[in-house]
């Protein structure tokens, strides 16, 4: 779609990481993860924990780093929006991304946030267009940061196959 053509899409590699780091402001030091999938949230959180000790989450096994208030991020924060904390009486974020989209905009306003990591899960039980439903919010989040002289990096992981609807290619 034309929305996707306007995005600066790249696969992750070391030169790209160095380039991104150079574009960040000194105060931009935190990663925020906004996940639909609990396993993807967990794996990403533990990967970040290998380099950083201050990683908070609503699914953090260490009580010291479990968020007391899921509506307020602390330092590096990884949220599983599919956890009961967020889905009690509400649809799962793979079906309805509204909660996660609101949080994306909120996190974009934090001048200490450098990167927002998100997953998009395709296939049965998922939103008919999970990426498309979030594109405008991603552009808005980047614009919020740009208006404050910051570049906000969105790192997205798409989980699916060409047999899923929508397909991985779409």
Please report, for each region that a protein language model flagged, where it lies by residue:
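C-terminal non-catalytic interaction/assembly regions of soluble proteins
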Residues: 4, 22, 85-86, 90-170
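Conserved alpha/beta enzyme-core scaffold
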Residues: 4-11
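Structural motif
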Residues: 11-30, 40
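Short glycine-cluster motifs
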Residues: 27-28, 33-105, 110
């Amino acid at each position: 779609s034309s929305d996707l053509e306007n995005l600066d899409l790249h696969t992750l590699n070391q030169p790209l990481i160095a380039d991104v780091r150079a574009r960040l402001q000194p105060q931009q030091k935190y990663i925020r993860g906004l996940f639909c999938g609990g396993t993807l949230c967990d794996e990403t959180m533990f990967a970040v924990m290998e380099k950083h000790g201050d990683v908070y989450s609503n699914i953090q096994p260490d009580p010291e780093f479990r968020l007391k208030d899921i509506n307020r991020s602390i330092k590096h924060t990884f949220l599983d929006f599919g956890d009961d904390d967020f889905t009690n009486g509400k649809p799962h974020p793979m079906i309805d991304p509204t909660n996660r989209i609101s949080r994306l905009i909120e996190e974009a306003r934090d001048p200490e946030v450098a990167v927002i990591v998100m997953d998009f899960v395709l296939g049965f039980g998922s939103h008919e267009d999970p990426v498309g439903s979030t594109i405008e919010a991603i552009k808005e989040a980047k614009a919020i940061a740009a208006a404050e002289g910051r570049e906000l990096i969105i790192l997205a992981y798409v989980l699916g196959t060409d047999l899923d609807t929508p397909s991985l290619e779409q």
